[in-house]
Amino acid sequence: ITALCCPHFYLQRRETVNILLSMLKKLPEYEALLSALEARQAVAVSGVSQIIRSHFISALIAESERPALIVCQDDLAAQRAQAELAAFLGSTPPLLPARELTLYESASVSREWEHRRMRLLYGLATGKVKVLVASMEALSLRTVPRQTLFGGLVTLKCGAEYDLDSLTARLVRAGYSRTSLVEGVGQFALRGGILDVFSPAHDQPIRAEFFGDELDAMGFFDPLTQRRTENLDEAVLLPVAETVPFLHPDGAEGLCKDLSTLVARQKRRKTPNTALISTLEGDIDKLQGGVPLTAADRYMALIYPEFSTAADYVSRDAAVFFCDHGNLRRASKARMEDFGLSLDSYLQSGTLAGELCEFYCTYDELAGRFRENGAIYFDSFLSAQFPEELPPKRILSVTAKQLPGYGGSLETAVQDLKHYVKNGFGCLVLCGGKRRGEILKGMLAEQSVDALLAFPATRLPQAGQILLADGSLPAGMEYPELKYAILTEGQLMTRTAPKKTARPKKATNRKKLDSFTDLTPGDLVVHEHHGIGRYVGMEQMKVDGAVKDYVKIAYQGSDA
């Protein structure tokens, strides 16, 4: 605990990270990638595993000092990339989450992921978010256009004048609900000249105190104690959802007119879809009666005529990195196919109108949005097919590998270290702190392996030398051309948990999964209680205050 609180601890770790990033400057492939970034060209790189890819991306971001977007196949891959980048960059880049479309009307809808997305979209648009990690699905989902977002937000500034009636009306149009006490995001309360509001742009609710029409004072407050915690000069009140009916070019009235046109068109058909007509007319009544439309996503194409995704918020100056290009294409195809399978039930049940079903862009369309940026495609193996809109101008190959863990076997690790030393490699072993380094140094000495403590690390190890330095990585790395090996304390000192005696299992003819990695989106699976469904992917959900990973299975006639 003392070490974690010491600024010197962070300085030592930062110096180790800087050494790791500078190591790549000795590779001609790295210099070629840096030149391609400066020229805004597309380049493909093969032979890079997960940790190697993150090493390259971190070094390129640090040296180019440009904003960056890292695109991964799904949320789990994005979370792994996020953790690796945090180890190299010293700070955790935000992750843009995917979200489920709300196409069925419901009494209450959780918009936690939408709030997080709205904050990040605004951060991208204003340049506050410099590095972003996103899954293919999160990036390709249709969303509020950038210009519309800025037109729908409210900015509060101390000293400025506001008409409270007009201000609260704007909040209602932005999707906020009026309550007596503000407890969650998307709520506001007005008591005399005091306005409490909880915007997705902030971690805490805001209390704005007015003297007449002038905003006299403003600050955050604790929703539990209702006490002010920090003063503010300016605050941004973002729309509370990605699809807000009032953000239609002609407001809610314009959306009602569009829905009425769809109803009239259906009634003129020989075989009108009565279920769809009922849905449309019911939503028109809600809009005209001022009732919140929780399933506004189904009218996204009407509310936002311009097809826009999170990619449109990314700066034209940003460096774009596509991770596992082949998997990205497969993930995009699986998402489109999965949604296509659900469309039949949406159309038959009258949930969606046939002309309003465009919610995702393809991988090729997404890549085409970055023509001005250029891009770098990272793959373990060379891919034969790249997006036509953004093909690589050059293909590079890197010789490097990710090192496996030793399963707690120090003897195996010692053999590898001796092999590296014998072959003239410089070995850098990352420890969790100086005390841990001293312990590891003693353990290696018992195995006749000489190692030097480097706290702080000011240089890379020389040929045949082992340095123990501060730092941590999810996995080790080997660069044969540079003759460097980077190992982690976790590889060397992990202890395996004692094995439990397996209970005898009943005989079954079912084929059970050894790992969920055996599944690919679109596979048919049999749930023990719910029957046959289609595997969609892994999804994180917050249950009882804890965030856990869950398997998502789609069934006919329902979302999941």
At which residue positions do the language-model features occur?
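ASCE RecA-like P-loop NTPase motor cores
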Residues: 7-560
